[in-house]
Amino acid sequence: MASDVLIKSIQMHDDPVEESVSPARVGLAVKGVKPDDVGRGDMICDDSTTFGSKTEIELEFEKNPFYKNEIAENQGCLVNIGLQVKAAKFLSITPLKLAFEKPIVCKAGQIAVILKPESPTIRILGSGKIL
């Protein structure tokens, strides 16, 4: 969701602060967004940030050596980046490209973990750095 949001105040442990960095837990008083519009893993960024909302990513992928099944194009999976977990499909295997059902916020260099929750054995398919 790309929209203008005004941060009125930030608090850490009931004390007002001017700014905070990850992984601090903060409370925000905001204007321009409702609680139902925000979910786990959502980010508030200024326009100059290196993060972007993407529907496709390419990875420098390393398959989990314990995951024995094959990976095929158009196969579904879940992708974890930070606190976000989104559904995706494999567009290509070499190089590994993923298409998301809903946009995901990420930047080059972050690690993405690919999951197959329906797998009866190993559920972590592998991981890779976002290119």
Across the structure, where does each feature detected by a protein language model lie?
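C-terminal effector/interaction modules appended to NTPase cores
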Residues: M1-L131
